Every structure is written in structure tokens, then in C-alpha cells.
Amino acid sequence: MASESGKLWGGRFVGAVDPIMEKFNSSISYDRHLWNVDVQGSKAYSRGLEKAGLLTKAEMQQILQGLDKVAEEWAQGTFKLHPNDEDIHTANERRLKELIGEAAGKLHTGRSRNDQVVTDLRLWMRQTCSKLSALLRVLIGTMVDRAEAERDVLFPGYTHLQRAQPIRWSHWILSHAVALTRDSERLLEVQKRINVLPLGSGAIAGNPLGVDRELLRAELNFGAITLNSMDATSERDFVAEFLFWASLCMTHLSRMAEDLILYGTKEFSFVQLSDAYSTGSSLMPQKKNPDSLELIRSKAGRVFGRCAGLLMTLKGLPSTYNKDLQEDKEAVFEVSDTMIAVLQVATGVISTLQIHRENMKQALSPDMLATDLAYYLVRKGMPFRQAHEASGKAVFMAETKGVALNLLSLQELQTISPLFSGDVSHVWDYSHSVEQYSALGGTAKSSVEWQIRQVRALLQAQEP
């Protein structure tokens, strides 16, 4: 229980803590986010103490009722912090003592803040992962719905930011949706590793008082129990894994945002953002800026920084708990808030995006069919390397003459290869071009529809 100084650890100390150190050491400004899960963990632990014979039933009921009152005050915004509340655990225990008296001093029996805080963090992150998983599935579902509705729209596909081949607009959407399905799978796997109970591990050596950890696990609905008390209280690999998941997901979202920023410029004019996800200029009245997408792109760097920062904190720590681990929570809270906002904004952008079909169509050009010209020769029996060279010669001839590739006459093409014949005219049909790529995963309509079914099946399988 807290000493006269209000500290949970004050018994062996003489004199006051330097006020600067007091502020430096305090984490209540941000770990107050854990108030609800801290109460949940304490309620479960009180039941464990009662089963172990360390609390009477009356004492347990007194503690449970007091904790309910603490939670009620937090929920209603009436909980008052004191200057000595250095963290959420101190604050809740101090208030519990004010409400129920000395019985509150038994709650911490055999428990350390080391196993308490990591239990709180795992509980909080488990809830947050569920929320993020739901938001990510909504975004992916929105993208798939759009891909299905606009699967007949063709536009240029790019490599090296140069026009490459005609593809379906839906194929582009699905390329990003499929990447996000892997992020969705990864998040569920991270959540499984978060969902492991450390409570009952004490500070380092374990619990000597017969507390039933299986009871604690069941009370808090954890999937498993940590295997080693030293590892349980000091390891933050689950935090690092969550931050890496967020970094990778933000990488995918940032790349999609970059594409849409480019496609929305006057130079491309393929898409137009809704006013709801754009802003203007304080000087230039004509401007409509894609701030939503630019912020998604920029916040990726913020998330990366949090991930790298935590790894740097962890890499040099000696075994078991060190105060350095206090740095984990700000990273988790900030990244969680960022991801929630980004996923919601990205869903809004995709659901309200306007596409300019005619501009997409006009951007298609015959030179993008040079690969198809090579495939034409392959189907006539020419080895691909020779066909590639022949198509390249046709491109060079067209550029030299200053004409489009499809305007070369049959006679001119036959000077490159006698395998060219009248049916080469089919090569210049963009719809015919995309339909060639019918192998699973390609841009043909049948393949795009197969992709849509596959992604929807993945989403359904991930529903809780």
C-alpha cells in the first residue's frame, strides 16, 4: 500500500523526491489511458487472492465494490488525480483506500507493478487490436466493393512511373486491397501473441502465495499464461511486433496515397477527391489540395519512428524490468490513435473518390501494347527473346517515323518479321489486351472477379 508519502515504494526512503525528478518519473499523464484495464486486472487479482485464502469473501466484495466506484469516477470524468499519483496504479490504489479503507492494502499482496502494468498493457492492446482489425476490414471491403462496381474501367498501369501496360482500374484497387489483407492477417497473429497473461509473475521470481494463474487467465479471458516470470515482466516484443505491424500497414497505405495523389493531379486527371477529404489554399483560390492523402503519407514516418525508437530502447536492456520500459506506452497509444484515424480517413477517401473514365481511356496509348505485339509473334511460334527484339524494332521504327505504333503498315511490320499478318490489327484493341491476362491474378475480367471473391472470402474468415 502507499506509504505516508503516497508512494507505493516509500518505506525505505528518507526525504522528499526532487520535484524535477517527480515530474520526470511520472507517467500518469499518458498511462491514465489504462484506467479501465487496470481496474479489470485488479478485480481479477482480488478473486485470485480470495481463492488463495489471502482475502476473506467480505474483503473481496469490499474491494470489488470499491474498484467499481473507481471505474465509475473515471468513466464520468470525476476522478481527481493527486500530485503523488505517479502512475495509474498508484492513482487507483490511492483512491481505493480512500473509498474502502485499509482493506485496499491487501490488494497488492504478491503483485508487483511489473506484472500489473504489462497485464494492463496487454489488455488494452488486445482491445485496440480488435478495433483496428474491424476498421481495416471495413477499408478492404470498401475497396473490393469499388473494384467490383468499376471492373470494366481501363487505364494505364505504370512501372518506374512510366506507362507500361493497359490494366483494369479494379486491378489497381485490388493490388492495394490484397496487400492490406496480409496486414489484416498479421494483426490477428499479433493479437494472439498479445493475448497471453503475465499477471501472477510478481516482480521477477513469480508468486509465492498460491495465487491460481489459471483462474486469473479465465477471469481476464486470456488465451494462455506466460511460461517464465522474468520473461513475462520484462519482455516487450509484443509491443515491438505491434509497432512493426503498424509500420508495414502504413507503408501500404502510404503507397496507395501516393498513387492517388499523382492520379489526382491535372497532369493525370484520373481521379478527384471529395471536398470532404480535401482542403484549400489561404492564398490561391483555385487550389484543392489532397491533404487527407498527404497526411496518410506523412504519418507513416511518424509510425516508423515510434517502432525504431522502441527497438533502440529494448536492444541494450539487462534482464527483467527496467524503467526504460515506461517508454513503451506512449508509443503504443500514439500509434494506435494514428492508425485508427488513418484507417477511417482512408475508407472515406476510397468510398467518395470520383474517377474520370474518359481521361483514363484517353491516357491509353498504342506504345503500351508493344508487349502484346511480342506475344503476337510468340503465338506465331517465334521464341520470346526474338519476339521482344522484333517488337522493339517496331517501336523504334514508329518513333523514327513520328507515328503511333499502331499506324505502322503491315508492309512495314513485315520488314521486321514475315510472321506479321493481317490479324495483327487485333493487337491494338485495349479490351482485347487486358483479356489476354486471364491466368489467376491477372487483369482479365474473369481474373479480377476471382480476386474479388478471394478477398471477400478472406474477410469473411477473419470476422470474429
Curated annotation (Swiss-Prot):
Site (Increases basicity of active site His) location in chain: E294
Active-site residues from the entry: H160 (proton acceptor), S281 (proton donor)
Record comment: activity regulation: Enzyme activity is regulated by acetylation.
GO molecular function: argininosuccinate lyase activity; identical protein binding
Annotated PROSITE patterns: FUMARATE_LYASES (PS00163)
Annotated binding of 2-(N(omega)-L-arginino)succinate, by residue: S27, N114, T159, N289, Y321, Q326, K329
InterPro entries with a match to the protein in the record: Arg_succ_lyase_C (IPR029419), Argininosuccinate_lyase (IPR009049), Fumarase/histidase_N (IPR024083), Fumarate_lyase_CS (IPR020557), Fumarate_lyase_fam (IPR000362), Fumarate_lyase_N (IPR022761), L-Aspartase-like (IPR008948)
UniProt pathway annotation: Amino-acid biosynthesis; L-arginine biosynthesis; L-arginine from L-ornithine and carbamoyl phosphate: step 3/3; Nitrogen metabolism; urea cycle; L-arginine and fumarate from (N(omega)-L-arginino)succinate: step 1/1
PTM comment text: Acetylation modifies enzyme activity in response to alterations of extracellular nutrient availability. Acetylation increased with trichostin A (TSA) or with nicotinamide (NAM). Glucose increases acetylation by about a factor of 3 with decreasing enzyme activity. Acetylation on Lys-288 is decreased on the addition of extra amino acids resulting in activation of enzyme activity.
Domain of life assignment: Eukaryota
UniProt modified residues of type N6-acetyllysine: K7, K69, K288
Residues the record lists as N-acetylalanine modifications: A2
GO biological process, one term: positive regulation of nitric oxide biosynthetic process
Main EC class the enzyme belongs to: lyase
Keywords on record: Acetylation, Amino-acid biosynthesis, Arginine biosynthesis, Lyase, Urea cycle
Tissue: Expressed in lung and brain (at protein level).
Known partners and oligomeric status: Homotetramer. Forms tissue-specific complexes with ASS1, SLC7A1, HSP90AA1 and nitric oxide synthase NOS1, NOS2 or NOS3; the complex maintenance is independent of ASL catalytic function.
Protein name as annotated: Argininosuccinate lyase
Lineage summary: Eukaryota, Metazoa, Chordata, Craniata, Vertebrata
